[in-house]
Curated annotation (Swiss-Prot):
Protein keywords: ATP-binding, DNA-binding, Helicase, Hydrolase, Isomerase, Nucleotide-binding, Nucleus
Name the UniProt record assigns to this protein: ATP-dependent DNA helicase SRS2-like protein At4g25120
Record's subcellular location: Nucleus
UniProt superkingdom: Eukaryota
Cofactor dependence: Mg(2+); Mn(2+)
Species annotation: Arabidopsis thaliana (Mouse-ear cress)
Result for mutant: K273R: Abolishes DNA-ligase unwinding activity
Signal peptide: none
Length: 1147
């Protein structure tokens, strides 16, 4: 890089003597052993030029694969008396500058033996060489300033140098074998002479090799003293220098590191990583880099906004605006659009989100099933839609294809994230996976689309296969900074490795906070970085400024149980100890919710302490479904709250608006037209489904688009399939789409277009949304039951897009007048990219409301008080849906532990753990296994750590152990479909249908049998579960199988059919889960079982009453009372009338 300053940390080879081996950097220290190290303090003559140059160099960054280590093994303090006296006599007798033949001299054998002894000595004994002072007063100095270095360099015996070269190389290899790990806090490993002629050893080296065991430096626990470079700070503007001084020593050391050295910053939770990255940017700007040459990459829009804002405060808004701060996908999208022709796409290609990707996978599975059945290759349709119900589906059942697609979606996501191709899958022996992945890629290519993983992989392809693109990126991005490095996938790391091939790269992350493995994140990227950038420097930020000491200690106690992490890390906190961690046992989810509400009211109304607002409180849960009970309860108790977990742009009403806008694009896919017809046709759900299926069938048979088939069908005067009213309503939908197209062509204002299209939603949509508006202050800020807030929310995004992405010139304004709303396409792409974002950068609406969110979505946020609810074994860790286990040594369980670590470190002052004993299905639950990993002196509450450990010990066996022994009889088709043994899928993105698959619901096994005979099955299990000999699920099932065999041998048995069916199903997964459920139930106290039974009876009695009221008409008294309350809604049933009365009475 021409515009970068010279690397002050590397050796200047121009002044190296030609006769000294370049691979051996110890020649200079060896010469220092043969001559006085420095001039006398009273010498007035300057040092020779060569010696000054060698001493002006700074330390180089740590290199794992160094070739020599003598600087740390050879003493620079050899007494002068061990050298031949000819040196002194020669130096005294010849003035500087006189060219006379130098005297010959040899090293004593004692010296050479001393070298060899020092080289092969133990590291502990080596440090003794540094006990002696660096300067010895009895040494002879060169009062005449003669160039000793030149004299010795010219006549040093080359054979001795070669011999010592060989010895030191052997020593380096031996040291590398004995100490494979690198220093936690990187220090120079080569000659580290200071630029000050009076200093011969860097201060940090002296401190590192201090022989006194009582003052050993513990780099994980103590922060090294790193003074700010005065020259660097003086060269910065005042605001920048003040910002650099505000950093702690480790942060400043990371920010001020040599910009030509790859830098790895391991930043623990709350350690100020954003401040460090901003400081790094300021240093890059101060070193002469242009803002446009700096690329900062992260994962969320909120993080990019925060970083840009902080840089703007110190470096100025103009510099902050010119720096490219982008998410991975936004950067890759821009790169792919610039070179779309090289990817066989148009520049207007579509970006498929989660829903469109799922439909494309469904279609890929359908094509594979057809090919397998027909034995021939089926042509790929030019659409990605839900084409399972059309004529092309043949005999493939839509439900079957959709079920398979759920499994294959994990495979495709993991494969795409790791850059796996169909050919690689085929080489691995996964022929089915190769075909489905190939079908999926063909569908995206035919639809001129890419998914989010394709954006990354295609960017890597552009950089690797097209040298001109690589050179363009190298010339543009001369320094790279990466945030949240632990969340990068394999392909994202490849992208970073190519962009940072010039070594000007800084990564910031924490392997203990890697929680997105389900989305392809690979925490081993740190090891890859160490391998690919061997001369890297590593700095660890270990001081937590966020949480109290009790919280930090508890979180550290949990995460240290992970084996696949750097065990030498130790996070500390200088905050107060704070309150102990509260662990509360609750009977069920309603009791848990009531406890949380009482605590919130107590905290916010406590007059004895500074009042805590609702905005300082958060409730974290593992699965989205766990937050619904809190939403309803908070509304009733008028507690303001907001839900981060609801994805705004996945709401149906918003998706309909976006689909109507997409129909104005020439590359609009059929899925958008389907959504519009489904929303605008004023028919019942089944009738609309039949109409859309018929249109799909016609479009497939004619091999035309969905809208073309719909136009032909509804523009016909008569139809043999549809009624006249259906044709009329279909024409109205087509007219509406035509109106939208004309509006976009005519109207220039993006806000006006979006508002008009939103108002085209049918009137019943507006009425339904307004009917359930909650006016008591406890509304959901992101809910789609308030259309006005949804529209305002959407318009706020339009305004933000215009202000940040639309800076037009006069020429562009002239083009805009001719083309109408040319910003619409960019806005839709902007929204599509944000579909996967979980948090808004704008939080002003949520400042005084309790936050309800999943643990995954809480990443990067913090609150004073945090409640982690439903901390049960089947929630945290969330057991795998296929076999209900989580291996202790597997990546799944370690990621679940990291997930809890992230949740705990969101809290500043107070942390609550809550777990339930019975779930909504009356299944007995156990507390999370992670709770027993917290030291008992940090806990307070109903359950101590010993109680938690006792609960786990009383269980029959750990789930993973039992399943592993029972797994020989249980075969899961899903394990054959995926390459990964365990895939951790967060419930944040799971559908409602898949929720039950994750929970250990024992009653699913009973549903295999008729209601009349379930008691036989239940009695058989419960009877033998009471026996002490059958307290393990596998032994209980074996006993039940044996008893069934005996009973079948009895001729007069009445339930032989039931017993045969039961015996054949005992090898299933659900049988094992039911056995666990029965064992847990029998271990409960008798009074607890009686209480649960009464609750069940009351619940089912209430359901029977509601079902009865729901099928009967409202009474005249109910209708009259509703009229007296001012209600104009006609109740559809007695139950509906009862609820309307309650609602209007509350008003």
């Amino acid at each position: 890089m021409e515009n970068l300053p010279p690397n002050r940390g590397m050796w200047n080879q121009e002044y190296s003597h030609g006769r000294i081996s370049q691979s051996f950097r110890s020649a200079k220290p060896l010469l220092d052993r043969k001559r006085p190290i420095e001039n006398a303090p009273n010498s007035s003559n300057p040092l020779p030029q060569r010696m000054k140059e060698s001493m002006d160099t700074e330390s180089v960054s740590h290199n794992i694969n160094f070739n020599s280590t003598p600087l740390m093994e050879l003493s620079a303090n050899t007494p002068y008396k061990r050298l031949k006296p000819e040196i002194e006599s020669y130096a005294d007798g010849h003035p500087c500058g006189l060219r006379t033949p130098p005297p010959r001299f040899d090293l004593d054998k004692e010296i050479i033996n001393g070298f060899q002894t020092d080289i092969y000595a133990d590291v502990g004994s080596l440090s003794e060489a540094f006990v002696t002072p660096l300067k010895e007063p009895e040494r002879v100095t060169l009062s005449n300033g003669c160039s000793t270095s030149s004299i010795l360099d010219d006549d040093f015996d080359d054979s001795i140098l070669e011999e010592i070269d060989l010895i030191c190389e052997q020593s380096a290899r031996k040291a590398a074998c004995q100490t494979p790990t690198t220093s936690i806090y990187q220090t120079p490993s080569k000659d580290n002479k200071s630029s000050d002629p009076k200093a011969s050893l860097d201060f940090r080296d002296v401190e590192k090799f201090e022989p006194d065991s009582n003052v050993k430096l513990k780099l994980d626990e103590e922060t090294p003293t790193i003074a700010a470079d005065p020259a660097l700070l003086n060269s910065m503007p005042d605001e920048c220098s003040k910002y650099m001084l505000s950093l702690n020593d480790r942060q400043r050391d990371a920010a001020c590191s040599n910009i030509s050295t790859p830098l790895m910053v391991i930043a623990g939770p709350g350690s100020g990583k954003t401040s460090t990255m901003v400081g790094r940017v300021l240093v890059l700007l101060n070193e002469g880099l242009l803002p446009s040459n700096i690329l900062a990459m992260t994962f969320t829009k909120a993080a990019t906004s925060e970083m840009r804002e902080r840089i703007g405060k110190s470096a100025g808004k103009k510099a902050a605006k010119d720096i490219t701060i982008s998410t991975f996908h936004s950067f890759s999208l821009q790169l792919c659009r610039m070179h779309a022709d090289k990817l066989q796409r148009t520049s207007e290609f579509s970006v498929y989100g989660h829903g469109q990707q799922r439909r494309a996978i469904i279609e890929a599975v359908r094509l594979y099933e057809e090919e397998k059945k027909n034995g021939s290759k089926t042509s790929v349709p030019c659409e990605s839609g839900e084409g399972l119900n059309g004529a092309g589906a043949g005999a493939v059942c839509p439900e079957y294809a959709k079920d398979l697609s759920k499994k294959w979606q994990k495979f495709v996501t993991q494969g795409k994230a790791s850059g796996k191709s169909p050919e690689q899958c085929r080489k691995m022996g996964n022929e089915i996976g190769a075909k489905i992945l190939g079908n999926y890629n063909d569908i995206l290519k035919a639809c001129d689309a890419l998914d989010y993983h394709d954006l990354i992989s295609c960017s890597v392809t552009l950089l690797s296969d097209f040298p001109e693109v690589f050179k363009e990126c190298q010339d543009t991005w001369k320094a790279i900074i990466v945030d949240e490095f632990q969340d990068t996938s394999t392909m994202q790391y490849k992208l970073l490795r190519m962009l940072g091939s010039h070594n000007h790269i800084t990564i910031v992350g924490d392997d203990d906070q890697s929680i997105f493995g389900f989305n392809g994140a690979d925490s081993s990227g740190f090891d890859s970085f160490r391998r690919d950038f061997p001369n890297y420097k590593e700095v660890r930020l270990i001081k937590n400024y966020r949480s109290s000491r009790h919280i930090v200690e508890a979180a550290s106690s949990i995460i240290k149980n992970n084996t696949k992490r750097c065990q030498s890390k130790s996070i500390s906190s200088e905050n107060s100890q704070g309150s102990k961690i509260t662990v509360k046992e609750c009977h069920n989810e309603e009791a848990q919710c009531a406890y949380v509400i009482d605590k919130i009211i107590e905290i916010t109304n406590d007059g004895s302490t500074p009042c805590c607002s609702h905005g300082d409180i958060a409730i974290l849960y593992r699965r989205q479904v766990s937050g619904k009970v809190f939403q309803n309860a908070f509304r009733q108790r008028k507690i303001p709250f907001n839900v981060h977990g609801v994805a705004f742009y996945r709401k149906k009403v918003v998706q309909v608006i976006l689909a109507m806008l997409k129909t104005t694009f020439s590359e609009c896919d059929d899925a958008s037209y389907r959504r519009v017809f489904k929303a605008l046709l004023p028919f019942e759900k089944e009738e609309k489904k039949r109409i859309i299926e018929h249109i799909e069938k016609i479009s497939t048979s004619r091999k035309c688009s969905f809208i073309s088939a719909a136009s032909d069908i509804f523009n016909a005067k008569i139809s043999g399939t549809f009624k006249r009213s259906q044709l009329t309503q279909g024409r109205k939908v087509l007219q509406t789409l035509d109106m939208v197209a004309k509006l976009v062509d005519r109207e220039q204002s993006l806000s006006a277009v979006v508002t008009c299209v939103a108002n085209m939603i049918p009137q019943k949509y507006l009425l339904e949304q307004r009917a359930v508006v909650d006016n008591d202050g406890g509304k959901l800020l992101n809910e789609d039951n308030d259309l006005r807030s949804v529209l305002q929310y959407l318009m706020d995004d339009v305004a933000e897009f215009i202000s940040t992405h639309c800076t037009t010139t006069e020429e562009e304004d002239a083009i805009k007048e001719k083309k109408g709303c040319n910003q619409l396409h960019s806005f839709i792409n902007y929204i599509s990219e944000r579909e996967t974002e979980n948090f808004r950068s704008r939080r002003r609406d949520n400042e005084n409301s309790v936050t309800l969110t999943t643990i995954h979505q809480s990443k990067g946020l913090e609150w004073d008080i945090v409640f982690i609810v439903k901390a049960n074994e089947n929630e945290i860790p969330l057991l795998h849906e296929s076999n209900g286990n989580a291996s202790e040594s597997g990546t799944s369980l370690e990621e679940e532990r990291r997930l809890l670590y992230v949740a705990m470190t969101r809290a500043r002052k107070k942390l609550f753990f809550l777990y339930v004993t019975v779930d909504s299905n009356w299944q007995v639950l156990q507390p999370s296994r992670f709770l027993k990993e917290i030291p008992g002196h940090l806990l307070q509450g109903d359950m101590s750590v010993n109680d938690c450990r006792k609960v786990h010990e009383n269980l029959p066996n750990k789930t993973e152990q039992s399943v592993s022994s029972f797994g020989t009889d249980i075969k899961h088709e899903e394990s054959k479909l995926t390459d990964n043994d365990v895939m951790n899928i967060p419930e944040d993105y799971a559908s409602e249908e898949s929720i039950a698959a994750y929970a250990l619901n024992g009653n699913n096994f009973l549903k295999r049998f008729d209601v009349e005979v379930r008691s036989v099955v239940s009695h058989l299990f419960h009877n033998w579960a009471k026996k002490q000999a059958f307290q393990e699920p596998k032994r209980l099932i074996d006993k039940v199988r044996f008893v069934i065999g005996e009973r079948l041998a009895i001729k007069k048995n009445k339930h032989k059919d039931v017993l045969r069916a039961l015996k054949s199903s005992l090898t299933s997964e659900e049988a094992f889960q039911y056995a666990e459920h029965v064992l847990r139930w029998e271990q409960l106290p008798a009074d607890t079982r009686a209480h649960i039974v009464r609750e069940k009876q009351e619940h089912f009695q209430k359901l029977r009453i509601e079902n009865s009221m729901g099928t009967s008409e409202a009474t005249s008294k109910q209708i009259a009372f509703l009229h007296s309350l001012g209600c104009t809604v006609v109740p559809t049933s007695r139950l509906h009338a009862s609820r309307l009365i309650e609602q209007y009475k509350s008003l």
